[in-house]
Design a protein with these regions (language model features):
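Hydrophobic alpha-helical membrane-embedded segments
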Residues: 73-99, 168-185, 277-286
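Individual transmembrane alpha-helices with interfacial aromatic-anchor signatures
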Residues: 130-134, 336-343
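Multipass alpha-helical transmembrane domains of eukaryotic endomembrane proteins
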Residues: 153-157, 176, 196-265, 269-290, ...
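Membrane-helix cytosolic exit motif
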Residues: 283, 341-360
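Helix-loop-helix junctions within predominantly alpha-helical proteins
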Residues: 2-74, 106-183, 188, 195-213, ...
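Alpha-helical interaction elements in eukaryotic regulators
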Residues: 93, 100, 118, 186, ...
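Charged, amphipathic alpha-helical oligomerization/scaffolding segments
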Residues: 76, 80, 96-99, 103, ...
Length: 362
């Protein structure tokens, strides 16, 4: 019994369909050519506005009696701000997101017919995306005029909490999906470069007339790789910055709440906050590793097998590859695990200050 191999375009198509499903649940499927603002989009915006209004009024009414309630409410504000940033970025860069999606679909169609090695690299990229997606997988406000001590008031408040939570969960998930998909492709570009370099070396060793054409393909591929990273940096600039900053602030607020023991859900939420912080930073580190590997693979070209004019063509690319574009946080910090560790050290320092403060006031 023989098993039919799945075509890379089919594998990638399943990923895109899954993304369309999650994005459409929050009315923000901007990667669809026929997308229009709909009732779900409007409902999502209403939920966001309601969350901030009711959180503000609740904190204002409770703050004088219990100031720690402000910290409890602030913990989840970070996640809401992350969701808003992802939503605004999706609308602001809708054309770019749609363009990259079409680009990637065309890339899969173009390279899957070039041989089994290319098809294997494409399928491997889809598997990587699915593996990362599998890693990503109530609120503190009341409605003014609604008595939560009554059954009807409690159910009304709980219903609004649930709507905000579901929209927030799917909204954050949809934003993370596109981040993981787009920033997961440079690893595919590296795999394809390995195959291109192999073909060039074989052609150069045989003094084939195709060597120059293959070299030009590699030069254009490196230019595309650099341009792709720059576009991703532009699209995800605000998302990355908001994700890292709000995750850090949310962790600090949640740690203080844990010390006070006022919110049982804080233990779960702090894991979510740390997960969001490190997920983005790990993807940034993968891009850094990919940049290094991309440069090293260019050095694997058999330089002395090339003609002199072709040797001169490759020197500028080798120089450019040693200074690659990186994904930045706030335009100056590299998105990497090292940055996450620095933030964690800062959080630990603030945490020890909290402990001393509480000990002095006991």
């Amino acid at each position: 019994m023989t098993t039919t191999k799945v075509r890379p375009t089919e594998s990638f198509g399943k990923i895109i369909k899954f993304f369309h499903l999650i994005s459409s649940l929050v009315g923000a499927d901007v990667a669809d050519e026929n997308y229009r603002v709909n009732i779900i989009t409007i409902t999502l915006i209403i939920c966001i506005v309601a969350y901030f209004i009711f959180t503000g009024t609740t904190v204002a009414s409770v703050f004088s009696e219990n100031w720690t309630y402000l910290l409890e409410a602030s913990c989840m504000v970070g996640s809401v701000l992350q969701g808003i940033t992802k939503l605004i970025s999706a609308f602001a860069f809708a054309k770019e997101i749609l363009g990259i999606r079409i680009e990637l679909e065309n890339l899969y169609r173009e390279y899957e017919v070039k041989g089994d090695d290319y098809a294997e690299a494409l399928n491997k990229s889809c598997e990587r995306v699915w593996q990362v997606i599998k890693m990503v997988f109530l609120m503190h406000f009341m409605i003014p005029g609604i008595d939560v001590d009554t059954q009807v008031g409690y159910l009304m408040t709980l219903t609004l909490h649930t709507m905000c939570f579901l929209f927030g969960a799917f909204g954050l998930f949809a934003g993370d999906l596109f981040f993981l998909l787009f920033l997961g492709q440079p690893m595919l570009f590296l795999d394809l470069l390995v195959l291109k370099v192999k073909s060039l070396n074989e052609a150069a060793a045989e003094n084939s007339s195709n060597a120059e054409r293959l070299l030009i393909e590699i030069i254009e591929w490196h230019q595309y790789y650099t341009d792709y990273n720059l576009r991703c940096n532009r699209i995800f600039y605000y998302i990355n910055s908001m994700q890292i900053v709000t995750s850090g602030i949310s962790i600090i607020c949640t740690l203080y709440i844990i010390l006070l023991g006022d919110w049982p859900g804080a233990y779960l939420y702090i894991l979510v906050a740390f997960g969001g912080l490190y997920l983005y930073c790990i993807m940034g580190t993968k891009i850094q590793t990919c940049n290094t590997a991309f440069c090293e693979e260019l050095w694997n070209i058999n330089f002395y097998d090339l003609e002199v004019k072709n040797q001169k063509m490759i020197i500028p690319i080798l120089m450019k590859a040693q200074n690659p574009s990186e994904i930045k946080v706030g335009g100056f910090l590299p998105l990497s695990v090292q940055t996450a560790l620095q933030i964690t050290k800062t959080i630990y320092g603030i945490f020890t200050m909290m402990l001393r403060f509480l000990e002095e006031n006991q």
